[in-house]
């Protein structure tokens, strides 16, 4: 009986208070289910699993961009041929090169996706067996896509899901070996239905179908078939869906685009042509926006990528200019972990390093009001930078406000107050007329704030922004102090008491009944010997046999 009561309480506490699908890797960090990102070492390179703060930062950025059209969402990524899939990638402890091992490269590829890289440019060519392979390797494109499918399947939930970009750079030249003299002849293929029928391994549509799966791919026919309403706050005049509509409405996880111009849309109806993106390579003249008109113009350009060999400061700068950096630096198995530091400013463009800090319990003896559940925008004038930090919601600060008419116009409130007084929930807002309490939702918007504050000689300050984890700790949402967490059910103190009272009363009654039956036994059960004697005496009076 006591064990039943105990199990009942455990079941209630586990399933009645929290509704979450997170899974722990056993080391205190939350990782996508099914993806092995435990610390792995190979040739002096150790890849550390993500910290919980990093995962919260990436998730909060994704969520605040849910109303941004996908062509304006940053997709930081890498050139797979330069970073992983090249003949000099595998080295031993002495620095000597070893034969290429694609299983090791695939392991790091999974780790890079888990860290937060979202776009991958792949140089492909036709191999000797008329199959698509990564250029200058024997790695099949289909094997690479299977790795992407495994990641998509393992992260196909609201906690870890995100959209990936596959960018194909196609070399249409095929190298044919003569059987007689082993001479290599070059021939340029014309991709037609007849060629695909003769060599099905060259049919990109079929490869994507058999690896990723049609249900996960957002195709040109999806784009042309139905238009999602432009719920975004940017000035884009196109009809690309918002990130939220693509992920949660259509449940799509991959866009495939071609950088070159080898495929006709009719032969590959799963791939967007290069007319849908801006892809620059190397030391090109890149202009960053500096005024409102330039910011608006930048926001009207779809899918801007810049592939180059970067430094960390350049990754941060070009991210702020509205580009998705495509890192083409050469790495090997000994220094591949340095890619994390290079990707970091693009993967987490908002929060400071180590932020958001995890919410901890507040000592009960304190007399001050403390709630470390609100985000603040920390502007530094001298080094032209800004990062987000977790602050006490009851602290008095000014707030960041966005113009209701011009999305790249910003200001700050004149008065300082707690976070709870800034969102206008009580009918009053501290922001000026035609301005609203807001938050920068892309690196481009964050850069517009920096330039505007710099031009107005705005002093170093920390401003409230529309982001908090008030409803559920460590679940960061925008929409004011009463915004709810989509991943957990929040239970207030009042509701918790209301839920616990009937359970406690019922449990107390059951406990009293158990005590009663254990202390005051039934008389017949307690006097078993006397009862057995009465039965035996009665049996003696009965007549044996059949009466005559």
From Swiss-Prot:
Membrane topology according to the record: Single-pass type I membrane protein
Taxon lineage: Eukaryota, Fungi, Dikarya, Ascomycota, Saccharomycotina
One of the record's GO cellular component terms: endoplasmic reticulum membrane
Family: Belongs to the MTC6 family.
Organism annotation: Candida glabrata (strain ATCC 2001 / BCRC 20586 / JCM 3761 / NBRC 0622 / NRRL Y-65 / CBS 138)
InterPro entries named among the record's database cross-references: Telomere_Capping_Maintenance
UniProt-annotated location(s): Membrane
TM segment ranges: 496-516
Protein name (Swiss-Prot/TrEMBL): Maintenance of telomere capping protein 6
One Pfam family recorded for the sequence: TIM-barrel_MTC6
GO BP annotation list: cellular response to hydrostatic pressure
Keyword Transcription regulation in annotation: no
Topological domains, Extracellular: 19-495
């Amino acid at each position: 009986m006591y064990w039943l009561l105990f199990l009942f309480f455990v079941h209630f506490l586990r399933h009645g208070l929290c509704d979450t699908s997170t899974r722990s890797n056993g080391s205190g960090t939350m990782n996508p289910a099914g993806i092995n990102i435990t610390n792995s070492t190979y040739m002096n390179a150790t890849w550390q699993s993500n910290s919980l703060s990093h995962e919260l930062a990436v998730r909060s950025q994704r969520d605040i961009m849910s109303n941004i059209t996908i062509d304006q969402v940053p997709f930081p990524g890498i050139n797979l041929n330069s970073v992983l899939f090249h003949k000099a990638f595998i080295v031993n402890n002495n620095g000597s090169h070893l034969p290429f091992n694609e299983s090791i490269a695939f392991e790091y590829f999974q780790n890079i996706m888990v860290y937060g890289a979202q776009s991958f440019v792949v140089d492909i060519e036709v191999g000797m067996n008329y199959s698509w392979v990564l250029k200058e390797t024997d790695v099949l494109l289909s094997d690479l896509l299977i790795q992407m499918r495994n990641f998509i399947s393992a992260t196909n939930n609201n906690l870890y899901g995100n959209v990936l970009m596959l960018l194909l750079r196609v070399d249409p030249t095929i190298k044919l070996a003569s059987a007689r003299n082993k001479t290599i002849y070059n021939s340029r293929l014309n991709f037609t239905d007849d060629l695909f029928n003769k060599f099905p391994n060259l049919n990109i549509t079929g490869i994507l179908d058999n690896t990723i799966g049609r249900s996960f791919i957002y195709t040109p026919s999806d784009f042309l078939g139905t238009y999602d309403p432009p719920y975004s706050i940017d000035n884009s005049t196109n009809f690309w869906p918002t990130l939220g509509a693509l992920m949660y409405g259509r449940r799509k996880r991959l866009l495939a685009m071609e950088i070159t111009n080898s495929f006709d849309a009719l032969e590959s109806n799963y791939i967007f042509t290069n007319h849908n993106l801006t892809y620059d390579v190397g030391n090109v003249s890149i202009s960053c926006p500096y005024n409102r008109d330039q910011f608006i113009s930048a926001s009207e350009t779809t899918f801007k990528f810049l592939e180059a060999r970067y430094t960390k400061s350049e990754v941060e700068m070009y991210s702020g200019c509205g580009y998705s950096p495509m890192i083409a630096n050469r790495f090997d198995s000994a220094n591949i972990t340095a890619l994390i530091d290079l990707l970091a400013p693009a993967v987490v463009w908002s929060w400071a390093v180590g932020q958001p800090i995890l919410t901890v319990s507040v000592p009960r003896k304190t007399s001050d009001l403390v709630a470390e559940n609100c985000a603040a925008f920390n502007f530094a004038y001298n080094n032209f930078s800004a990062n987000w930090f977790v602050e006490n919601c009851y602290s008095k600060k000014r707030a960041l406000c966005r113009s209701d008419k011009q999305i790249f116009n910003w200001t700050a409130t004149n008065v300082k107050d707690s976070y709870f007084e800034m969102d206008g929930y009580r009918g009053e807002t501290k922001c000026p007329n035609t301005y609203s309490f807001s938050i920068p939702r892309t690196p481009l918007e964050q850069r517009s704030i920096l330039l505007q504050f710099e031009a107005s000689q705005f002093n170093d300050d920390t401003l409230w922004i529309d982001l908090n984890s008030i409803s559920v700790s460590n679940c960061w949402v925008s929409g004011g102090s009463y915004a709810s967490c989509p991943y957990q059910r929040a239970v207030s103190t009042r509701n918790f008491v209301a839920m616990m009272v009937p359970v406690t009363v019922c449990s107390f009654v059951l406990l009293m009944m158990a005590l009663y039956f254990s202390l005051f036994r039934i008389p017949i059960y307690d006097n078993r010997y006397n009862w057995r004697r009465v039965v035996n005496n009665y049996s003696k009076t009965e007549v044996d046999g059949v009466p005559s």
